[in-house]
Amino acid sequence: MKPDYKNWIPKGMLFSLIAGTALSLALLLVFGAFGIGVSGKLRVVLGVVFGGAFVVCAKYTQWCVYAYRSFSYDGERKLSKQIIDGTAEHITLPEGGVGLDVGCGSGALTIACAKRNPQGKMVGIDRWGKEYASFSLSLCEKNAAAEGVRNASFRRGNALKLDFPDESFDAVTSNYVYHN
């Protein structure tokens, strides 16, 4: 079984942006270019508004498609893998030590740190909100099993209210979290 670490840019977000770009272009053509049902100043205003919306949506869509391809684990750049592996290289747990990964998403960083630290264990927490619905506790557990990692566990948690006593962890990681 192969792990499924997903992508930092959710597919649903890409589809929504593409739909928004197409809609703003259609409205620009209908009201701005062809002036169907409108004329004069209103046509100009609608043309400017929908033209601006189209440009903004198209540029943001272009950037998100580029980011999606860059962050893909299966793509050419594999930027996520480089970042995850590069971060995990800096985590060294003592014998019996415990590390915490805040905002673990699909478990990639938690699992990478656990693989590099078989003498310890890693705990991954995430709130797994609706904006990243493809990430879940179950996905993390499946990814750990796919990687053959047994020294990683996952649980629901909140980065703003960590439910652990002070001094519980020997290392703490967090990646792609504080942008939300």
Regions of interest found by a model, annotated:
Residues 1-59:
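N-terminal auxiliary segments of SAM/dcSAM-dependent transferases
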Residues 62-83:
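Class I SAM-dependent methyltransferase Rossmann-like catalytic core
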Residues 95-105, 123:
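Conserved class I S-adenosyl-L-methionine
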Residues 78-96:
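Conserved alpha-helix/loop element of class I SAM-dependent methyltransferases that forms part
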Residues 148-159:
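Conserved SAM-binding strand-loop segment of SAM-dependent methyltransferases
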Residues 170-180:
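A short SAM/SAH-binding and catalytic strip from SAM-dependent methyltransferases
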Residues 160-172:
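A short acidic, Gly/Pro-enriched loop at the edge of an enzyme's catalytic core
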Residues 106-118:
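Conserved SAM-binding loop of SAM-dependent methyltransferases across substrates and taxa
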